[in-house]
Amino acid sequence: MALQRSDVEKIAHLARLGLNEGELPRITDALNSILGLVDQMQAVDTTGIEPLAHPLETTQRLRPDQVTESNQRDRYQAVAPSTENGLYLVPKVID
């Protein structure tokens, strides 16, 4: 699947990216290169291969599930611009 210039323009519009005329060919080529790599990976036969979450057979050392620091909510809320009932109040950004 190859992207056309119009596809890249539409994607840029949806992502609210301001691309100029000089950038469009470079971005189109870069995206097509990425999609080509994805096509190559999808073409590989992986039948019988067990999926891996991590390429190495290692495990994470877990620490005990204990509280390691004190509750500092009151201290943080004392310096916050606006709080109410233990919550931080922020300006509305979406109508």
UniProtKB/Swiss-Prot annotation:
It comes from the Bacteria. Keywords: ATP-binding, Ligase, Nucleotide-binding, Protein biosynthesis. The keyword Nucleotide-binding applies. One of its GO terms (molecular function) is ATP binding. Coiled coil: none annotated. It catalyses: L-glutamyl-tRNA(Gln) + L-glutamine + ATP + H2O = L-glutaminyl-tRNA(Gln) + L-glutamate + ADP + phosphate + H(+); L-aspartyl-tRNA(Asn) + L-glutamine + ATP + H2O = L-asparaginyl-tRNA(Asn) + L-glutamate + ADP + phosphate + 2 H(+). GO terms for biological process: glutaminyl-tRNAGln biosynthesis via transamidation; regulation of translational fidelity; translation. Its EC number is 6.3.5.-. Pfam families: GatC. Transmembrane segments: none annotated. Disulfide bonds: none annotated. Belongs to the GatC family. NCBIfam families: gatC (TIGR00135). Allows the formation of correctly charged Asn-tRNA(Asn) or Gln-tRNA(Gln) through the transamidation of misacylated Asp-tRNA(Asn) or Glu-tRNA(Gln) in organisms which lack either or both of asparaginyl-tRNA or glutaminyl-tRNA synthetases. The reaction takes place in the presence of glutamine and ATP through an activated phospho-Asp-tRNA(Asn) or phospho-Glu-tRNA(Gln). Heterotrimer of A, B and C subunits. This is Aspartyl/glutamyl-tRNA(Asn/Gln) amidotransferase subunit C. It comes from Pseudomonas entomophila (strain L48). The gene is gatC.
